[in-house]
């Protein structure tokens, strides 16, 4: 699948998901390439249909895009609930376990998700996998002692790589932390791994989102298809 085909599937999923947002809602808006198409469609609806809703974003990038369309964006602490959050995912398996954080927004994404009544992911078909882990697992760490955390991960065989930008500098999250990507190839015991990561001193959050999502909208060549989590 080339990039144009993949973008077409992402756009279709984003447009389908935008239908979930109705007047008066408080909606969480995620981060990433698929979410950009979602926000484009919501911006169109605001302009052409008079849609009025309030957004809570998981990154400054999404906030800037949404505000460019005139969408009202507020801080998460200014709302008492979030009706639905729509976000992307880097991988999702049949058990509705996912990896997120390819865009370095995993901490804000998880905070918004855990405060949402409903969580929806939008992905193209390449993101649906049998077993998660082929996509490197992002882990957000504080800069102080980051090298020591990397050494601990190396000793455990997690194959960590500090994420760098085009200038060779560590990528910074919106909270000014670093991201370490774990090249695991496959994750057979995600719950155990999640517990090990979050109890490592220096780790702020990890990109494992386990059985959190309620619904996945998949951009498919035959049209968007919906996967509902039977456990939710």
Swiss-Prot record:
A Pfam family reported for this protein in Swiss-Prot or TrEMBL: Rib_5-P_isom_A
Domain of life, source organism: Bacteria
Record-linked Gene3D superfamilies: 3.30.70.260, 3.40.50.1360
Catalytic activity: aldehydo-D-ribose 5-phosphate = D-ribulose 5-phosphate
Positions of the catalytic residues: 109
Keywords: Isomerase
GO MF term set: ribose-5-phosphate isomerase activity
UniProt-annotated binding residues for substrate: 31-34, 87-90, 100-103, 127
Enzyme Commission number, as recorded: 5.3.1.6
Enzyme class, UniProt record, top EC level: isomerase
SUPFAM superfamilies associated with the record: D-ribose-5-phosphate isomerase (RpiA), lid domain, NagB/RpiA/CoA transferase-like
InterPro entries: NagB/RpiA_transferase-like, Ribose5P_isomerase_typA_subgr, Ribose5P_isomerase_type_A
Pathway: Carbohydrate degradation; pentose phosphate pathway; D-ribose 5-phosphate from D-ribulose 5-phosphate (non-oxidative stage): step 1/1
GO BP, one annotated term: pentose-phosphate shunt, non-oxidative branch
Isomerase as UniProt keyword: yes
Known partners and oligomeric status: Homodimer.
Family to which this protein belongs: Belongs to the ribose 5-phosphate isomerase family.
Function as written in the Swiss-Prot or TrEMBL entry: Catalyzes the reversible conversion of ribose-5-phosphate to ribulose 5-phosphate.
Protein name, per record: Ribose-5-phosphate isomerase A
Organism: Bifidobacterium adolescentis (strain ATCC 15703 / DSM 20083 / NCTC 11814 / E194a)
